[in-house]
């Protein structure tokens, strides 16, 4: 060990003695440039002139380089050169190669891609301009010329004056004096080839491609630059937009050309604004933002596909270039000479001149034919020769590594153009990262790992501690198994109390647990003679807050069996597993006997489906007894305690609360209908409601006197969102409901579990569009779209008692057509339907979504592996009903979305609302609970509200958790009581810094969320991005600049959103704060 420290000290001493010259910079051609204050190249901290240079350099496909002022977007200078792409190969029609139609797609770095019409595949050909030139020379049929050339030109950065040029012929003219302004270097790499007829000298075909690179002489190349604005690109449109950190436009400029490269010079640094980064593209920036909000890995782009006057071209990313180069090197050399046994020279006349220009040339055909032989399209065609195969979806072959390639479908294409006319451009994103497979290390690697642990004292101690722990666990397990009855009788009193508690939380229709079956089997009970009624549970007694009488399901007496059959006598020979299964089936079968009645159906009349999401459906129902309307939430529960405890959490929390600022709870019960009973009841119920709504819609439309063919909305009787929604799944049937996410690969068959925002979008058609369409057209996300409910259970605001099926409709619906045959929404200014029509159609859409219960599927994801199972295969389930106070069919989130002006948000009213929320939180905290998911979507308006006085109520307590007393560090109710809460639950946009860091947290997380909600009430954000960035600043501890617009509220909001929880006020201190008085 001492030798190690001696060597380390010697190395550090050596490094300290080595001189370091920070004033020298080197450029690519090894010319040393000395930094100084006078030459304007590098502005050091010690120089007097320290103004930051901010210039944007753009290169377009027509060969024009433009310099823009980074502060204003005004053009500083412009330099024109030859186009980067030209020639007959780049503007040719499809070529017929042996019966295969190929469309050539050249790349700017001199390679050729092909689009094969037969296989609908885009892939690189194993050929470049260099190999094409070599092949045509070897064939000797044409006179060819071409090659690669590199030209470097130096320009004054500020004036655009050309100082010098260096090419293959010469370099000059030089300047003996040191320039006063920085010099920008523009390097152009050109690959060109021309083929001519040897007799007539007529050009047959040609191709020229070029790339442009920009560097700063004496400057520093940096991958990322720190700037006050962000540059966004619309490459096909030639538009550059500068936005601030709140995504507000600073300036916008059109450079009149298809943009292929952009650089930014800031100070003495230069960095490329890559067109392969989706965050730099105007149309894909929101998708990147969404992936960050959902903690998903950002996809990078391998290729950029664009068109020039309607003809395609490709730009390869540096990664794609390197991968393709290594892959092509592994292919065998094209044996071009051996393919042509009898070369023929082509004659030239007026017709052949035209044909030559259309790439009708035998030499080129031969070269392309040999290249095509090695393509995947050729292999696909060979396999499908025997029969006619259906046309495949478009796919793009991109090299993943030097030895493999990946197929990229249209779902990974992103449009970069806003304009619907002119040329187009698409980013070709990499496929989603695959799950890392287990890999067995080689023996050498394994031995190295073992020795690294042997010589690491910490690792040895950890290994021994783990070994001792495993040994103790094994010994304890053996002792426990050797005397199960002794351990069972040690605490008979505790066991009786546990059994009593278990009785209180089950209904008569629940099947016995595995432990109970195990006890019956071990005690040798005769399952054939055990009466079903002997295994009976006491029903769940709801906590009453009204005089409504509770009822239990009637006990069904089993038929007495007088004769014992042969099957009964053979049960003694059954195995333990068979006895368990038999007992469970017989217990479950009691619910199939005649006489079952639904308490919900007997006591309530459903008026409307007002919400759905996660695992629940919320009905607006009228009590037959007192004729009052309530919000009744129904949740499907699997046959196990863990699932029941999860869904009972909200009911148990609500039962403890009695506060005007919290949704009121009345009572709850459970039902366990026979298999298929609930599905049939839902079908009848929803069909009846739909018929009533259709009749209402017919009457409304009948009264309308004018319609426009171009502005009409599709008839509501065809409006179905069933392809994008399924009945909520059963709680407890997912493998890991806390950590799994779901998706609908086939919406008409698979009903995915949704987040709050996704469910809301589905209600008004936003989710009907396919993923590819949304991403391709890059529709801007609505204000609620960036929110992702990463809840540990599936309660969402859509299940809350006032969630309206149409409450999340945007005020300005965008025009699009549903891909699933749903309602077609048109622009709000042209919509001839009134609000009543819209509302009725939304309700019908929800009903039709719920009506596909029998086709519902459960989609589970664990470690990115999809598992799809039919709902009916998940086992029997019970239904938990929670009766709650009915609120207005709008949330605070809906109000915020509609109230965009400051006039609609008087500060006095906003203060009153914040005070109401603080009062509700104070009550929760005093009761020892933390809400953990406070957001506008979980705040509702009471039906007792008036125009002058709105009463707010906090709802959706599915994530509310009990605290452990004085420290108020949250503890999971369904886990060990010593486990501190660090789980990342709630909505990410409204999480506190300690939640985002997975640290221990207290009730102060609700105060932080309240601060964000207060900010959203006081400040009217112009865009969703502005709100996201503001909240992100709060979560990072930065002070958002937008607070300067509300100086009277600034200190109050900063107190609530303090980075340190101890510095945030309590809910009582917020409610009594002088700012709110």
UniProtKB/Swiss-Prot annotation:
Similarity comment: Belongs to the protein kinase superfamily. Ser/Thr protein kinase family. GCN2 subfamily.
Protein EC: 2.7.11.1
Described function: Phosphorylates the alpha subunit of eukaryotic translation-initiation factor 2 (eIF2alpha), leading to its inactivation and thus to a rapid reduction of translational initiation and repression of global protein synthesis. May phosphorylate eIF2alpha during hypoxia. Proposed to have a role in alleviating endoplasmic reticulum stress.
Composition-biased stretches (Acidic residues): 783-796
Regulation of activity: Perturbation in protein folding in the endoplasmic reticulum (ER) promotes reversible dissociation from HSPA5/BIP and oligomerization, resulting in transautophosphorylation and kinase activity induction.
Signal peptide residues on this chain, from the entry's feature table: 1-23
Post-translational modification note: Autophosphorylated.
Binding site for ATP: 610-618, 633
Tissue: Expressed in intestinal cells.
Compositionally biased tracts (Basic and acidic residues): 766-778
Subunit annotation: Forms dimers with HSPA5/BIP in resting cells. Oligomerizes in ER-stressed cells.
Start-end of Polar residues biased regions: 732-746
Recorded phenotype for the gene knockout or disruption: After L2 growth stage movement is subdued and development is stunted. Increased sensitivity to tunicamycin which induces an unfolded protein response symptomatic of endoplasmic reticulum stress.
Name used for this protein in its record: Eukaryotic translation initiation factor 2-alpha kinase pek-1
Gene Ontology cellular component annotations, sorted alphabetically: cytoplasm; endoplasmic reticulum membrane; nucleus
Ion transport in keyword set: no
Matching PANTHER family: EUKARYOTIC TRANSLATION INITIATION FACTOR 2-ALPHA KINASE (PTHR11042:SF91), EUKARYOTIC TRANSLATION INITIATION FACTOR 2-ALPHA KINASE EIF2-ALPHA KINASE -RELATED (PTHR11042)
Transmembrane spans: 454-474
Lumenal topological intervals: 24-453
Residue stretches of biased makeup (Low complexity): 797-808
């Amino acid at each position: 060990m001492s030798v190690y420290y001696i060597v380390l000290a010697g190395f550090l001493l050596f490094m300290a003695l080595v001189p370091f010259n920070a004033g020298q910079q080197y450029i690519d051609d090894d010319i040393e440039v000395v930094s100084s204050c006078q030459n304007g190249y590098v502005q050091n901290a010690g120089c007097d002139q320290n103004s930051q240079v901010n210039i944007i350099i753009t290169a377009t496909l027509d060969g024009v380089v433009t310099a823009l002022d980074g502060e204003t977007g005004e053009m500083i200078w412009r330099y024109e050169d030859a186009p980067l792409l030209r020639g007959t190969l780049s503007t040719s029609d499809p070529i017929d190669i042996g019966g295969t139609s190929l469309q050539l797609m050249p790349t700017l770095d001199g390679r050729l891609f092909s689009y094969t019409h037969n296989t609908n595949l885009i892939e690189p050909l194993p050929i470049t301009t260099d190999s094409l030139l070599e092949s045509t020379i070897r064939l000797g049929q044409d006179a060819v010329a071409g090659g690669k050339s590199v030209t470097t030109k130096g320009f004054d950065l500020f004036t655009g004056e050309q100082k010098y040029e260096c090419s293959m012929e010469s370099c000059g003219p030089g300047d003996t004096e040191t320039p006063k302004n920085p010099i920008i270097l523009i390097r152009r790499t050109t690959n060109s080839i021309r083929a001519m007829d040897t007799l007539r000298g007529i050009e047959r075909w040609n191709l020229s491609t070029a790339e442009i690179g920009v560097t700063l002489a004496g400057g520093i190349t940096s991958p990322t630059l720190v700037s006050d604005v962000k540059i966004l690109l619309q490459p096909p449109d030639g538009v550059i937009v500068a936005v601030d950190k709140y995504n507000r436009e600073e300036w916008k400029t059109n450079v009149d050309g298809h943009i292929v490269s952009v650089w930014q010079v800031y100070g003495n640094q230069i960095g490329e604004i890559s067109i392969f980064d989706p965050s730099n593209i105007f149309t894909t920036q929101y998708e990147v933002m969404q992936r960050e909000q959902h903690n998903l890995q950002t996809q990078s782009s391998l290729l950029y596909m664009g068109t020039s006057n309607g003809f395609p071209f490709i730009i390869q990313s540096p990664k794609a270039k390197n991968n393709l180069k290594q892959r092509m090197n592994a292919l065998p050399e094209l044996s071009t000479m051996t393919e042509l046994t009898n070369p023929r020279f082509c004659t030239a006349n007026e017709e052949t001149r035209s044909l030559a220009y259309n790439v009708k040339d035998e030499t080129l055909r031969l070269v392309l034919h040999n290249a095509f032989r090695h393509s995947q399209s050729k292999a696909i065609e060979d396999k499908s020769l025997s029969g006619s195969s259906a046309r495949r979806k478009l796919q793009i072959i991109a090299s993943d590594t030097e030895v493999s390639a990946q197929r990229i479908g249209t779902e990974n294409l992103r449009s970069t153009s806003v304009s619907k006319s002119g040329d187009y451009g698409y980013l070709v994103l990499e496929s989603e990262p695959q799950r890392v497979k287990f890999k067995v290390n080689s023996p050498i690697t394994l031995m190295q790992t073992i020795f690294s642990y042997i010589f690491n004292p910490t690792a040895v101690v950890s290994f021994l501690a783990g070994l001792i722990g495993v040994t103790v666990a094994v010994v304890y397990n053996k002792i426990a198994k050797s005397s199960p009855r002794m351990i069972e009788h040690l605490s008979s009193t505790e066991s009786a109390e546990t059994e009593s508690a278990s009785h209180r939380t089950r209904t008569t229709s629940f099947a016995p647990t595995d432990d109970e079956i195990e006890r019956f089997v071990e005690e040798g009970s005769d399952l054939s003679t055990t009466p079903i009624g002997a295994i009976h549970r006491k029903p769940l007694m709801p906590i009453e807050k009204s005089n409504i009488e509770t009822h239990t399901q009637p006990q069904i007496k089993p038929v007495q069996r007088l004769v014992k059959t042969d099957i009964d006598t053979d049960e003694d020979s059954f195995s333990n597993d068979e006895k368990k299964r038999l007992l469970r089936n017989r217990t479950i079968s009691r619910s199939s006997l005649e006489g079952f009645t639904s308490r919900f159906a007997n006591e309530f009349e459903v008026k409307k489906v007002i919400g759905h999401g996660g695992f629940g459906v919320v009905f607006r129902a009228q009590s037959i007894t007192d004729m009052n309307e309530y919000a009744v939430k129904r949740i499907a529960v699997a046959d196990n305690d863990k699932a029941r405890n999860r869904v009972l959490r909200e009911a148990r929390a609500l039962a403890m609360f009695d506060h005007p600022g919290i949704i009121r709870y009345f009572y709850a019960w459970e039902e366990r209908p026979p298999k298929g009973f609930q599905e049939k009841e839902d079908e009848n119920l929803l069909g009846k409601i739909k018929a009533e709504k259709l009749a209402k819609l017919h009457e409304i439309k009948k009264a309308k006197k004018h319609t426009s063919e171009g502005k009409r909305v599709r008839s509501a009787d065809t409006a179905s969102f069933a392809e994008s929604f399924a009945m909520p799944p059963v709680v407890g049937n997912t493998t890991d409901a806390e950590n799994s996410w779901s998706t609908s690969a086939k919406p008409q068959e698979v009903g995915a579990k949704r987040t709050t925002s996704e469910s809301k979008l589905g209600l008004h058609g936003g989710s009907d569009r396919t993923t590819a369409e949304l991403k391709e057209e890059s529709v801007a996300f609505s204000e609620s779209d960036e929110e992702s409910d990463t809840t540990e259970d599936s309660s969402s605001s859509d299940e809350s008692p006032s969630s309206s099926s149409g409450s999340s409709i945007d005020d300005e619906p965008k025009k699009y057509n549903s891909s699933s045959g749903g309602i077609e929404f048109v622009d709000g200014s042209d919509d001839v339907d009134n609000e009543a029509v819209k509302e009725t159609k939304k309700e019908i859409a929800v009903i039709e979504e719920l009506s596909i219960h029998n086709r519902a599927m459960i989609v589970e994801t664990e470690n990115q592996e999809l598992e799809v199972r039919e709902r009916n295969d998940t086992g029997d389930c019970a239904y938990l009903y929670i009766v709650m106070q009915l609120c207005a069919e709008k949330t605070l989130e809906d109000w915020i979305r509609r109230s965009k002006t400051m006039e609609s948000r008087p500060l006095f009213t906003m203060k009153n609302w914040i005070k109401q929320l603080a009062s509700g939180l104070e009550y929760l905290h005093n009761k020892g609970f933390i809400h953990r998911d406070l957001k506008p979507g979980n705040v509702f308006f009471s039906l007792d509200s008036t125009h002058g006085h709105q009463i707010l109520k906090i709802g959706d307590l599915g994530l509310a958790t009990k605290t452990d007393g004085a420290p108020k560090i949250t503890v999971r109710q369904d886990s060990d009581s010593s486990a501190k809460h660090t789980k990342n639950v709630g909505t990410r946009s409204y999480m506190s810094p300690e939640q985002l860091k997975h640290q221990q947290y207290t009730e102060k997380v609700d105060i932080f969320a309240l601060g964000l909600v207060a900010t959203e009430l006081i400040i009217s954000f112009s865009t969703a991005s502005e709100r996201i960035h503001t909240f992100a600043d709060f979560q990072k501890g930065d002070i958002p600049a937008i607070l300067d617009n509300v100086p009277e509220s600034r200190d109050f909001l900063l107190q609530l959103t303090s980075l340190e929880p101890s510095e945030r006020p309590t809910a009582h201190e917020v409610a009594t704060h002088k700012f709110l008085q």
